[in-house]
A protein has these predicted regions:
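N-terminal membrane-anchoring/stem segments of glycan-assembly enzymes
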Residues: 1-124
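Short aromatic/hydrophobic "clamp" motif used to bind/position activated sugar donors
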Residues: 240
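The conserved acidic donor/metal-binding loop of glycosyltransferases
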Residues: 244-248
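Active-site beta-to-alpha loop of glycosyltransferases that engages the nucleotide-sugar donor
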Residues: 131, 138-153, 173-174
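Short, acidic, metal-binding catalytic loop of nucleotide-sugar glycosyltransferases
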Residues: 129, 151-166, 189, 263-264
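Long helical/loop segments within the catalytic core of UDP-sugar-dependent glycosyltransferases
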Residues: 117, 190-195, 209-229, 234, ...
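A short, charged/proline- and glycine-enriched loop
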Residues: 127-134, 236
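A conserved acidic beta->alpha catalytic loop
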Residues: 171-186, 202-207
Length: 299
């Protein structure tokens, strides 16, 4: 029987409460222990302080190394022509014959050749690239067109064909008339750009819901499911991406995800996490927020 992994409602068990408290207790205990040891024995306090500083230094070096390493990987991946690689998957036999002896050192090129070889041998098990669609769902509350517009523009300017992108603007009714007007204006502005531009208004106070982005996108997802059924689109070949209203998608992101989706045999049970860089409006944010944003980008 499948175990329920949801957060329990109501009273927790003693073990559950203990495990909830443990991370915070360890964090606060580590700080309190420094003062306690200093009162008991200054030498022990000094040794403990040195251990804390040394461990922090080691972690800082590790983060710095991984950050530089990750940056290099990102840059290598950005230099790849993902649109061309996706197009290669349409004709795996020809592409494999053309590339198998190529001494290309680009990001995951050898894996690309292996994928072509595998698809050439078992083509029916893989979807054709022209049968793959992206549903891009953007959650909004009360943001204006100056925030939402550039985010939609970034989706429009990706290398993935716009006629295979279904854009969904999921906005909150509690956002008022302003967001409803913004949504309608954006739909008119981007009419004909994507395969379709859907507006989904999330009602207030639905039973069993909490206020937040999750219920908004869940409600929109149900509307998209009905849309896909009405349009007879291949639901097994649809990739769903959720965005905040200020997220700017990288130009090659959709092609990169489509490539991974097509070439993976267990594609229906995959989820994709992009590298999030919190800096598209960093100069408009207060200094403390900038520090937090840069730190979050490191991780």
């Amino acid at each position: 029987m499948r175990k329920n992994l949801e957060i329990p409602q109501g009273k927790r068990t003693k073990l559950y409460r203990f495990l909830e408290i443990l991370p915070g207790a360890i964090s606060y205990g580590a700080i309190i222990l420094l003062f306690v040891l200093s009162l008991i024995d200054p030498v022990l306090g000094a040794i403990y302080l040195f251990i804390l500083i040394a461990s922090t230094l080691v972690k800082a070096i590790g983060v710095a190394y991984r950050t530089v390493q990750g940056y290099e990987v990102i840059k290598r991946a950005e230099r790849v022509d993902w649109r061309k690689r996706v197009e290669d998957l349409s004709h795996p036999h020809e592409a494999y014959e053309r590339l198998r002896d190529d001494n290309n050192k680009s990001y995951h090129f050898e894996q690309h050749v292996e994928n072509l070889k595998m698809m050439a041998a078992m083509g029916k098990e893989y979807p054709s690239p022209d049968k793959v669609y992206h549903v891009v769902m953007m959650a909004a509350y009360n943001e204006g067109p100056e925030i939402i517009g550039p985010s939609i523009e970034a989706v429009k300017n990706t290398t993935f064909p716009n006629d295979h992108i279904i854009f969904v603007l999921a906005y909150e009714r509690r956002g008022g008339e302003a967001i409803a007007t913004t949504a309608e204006n954006l739909k008119k502005q981007y009419k004909g750009v994507f395969r379709d531009f859907l507006l989904v208004q999330h009602p207030d106070n639905l039973p069993g819901e909490v206020v937040g982005k999750g219920p908004n996108l869940t409600y929109a997802g149900k509307a998209v499911s009905r849309y896909v059924a009405e349009k007879h689109l291949p639901v097994e070949n649809i990739i769903v991406t959720s965005l905040d209203s200020d997220n700017h998608m990288a130009p090659k992101y959709l092609d990169s995800v489509a490539y991974e989706f097509i070439t993976h045999p267990n594609r229906q049970r995959l989820s994709y996490q992009p590298v999030s860089l919190f800096m598209n409006n960093i100069w408009d944010a207060p200094a403390p927020t900038r520090v937090i944003a840069v730190s979050n980008s490191f991780f």
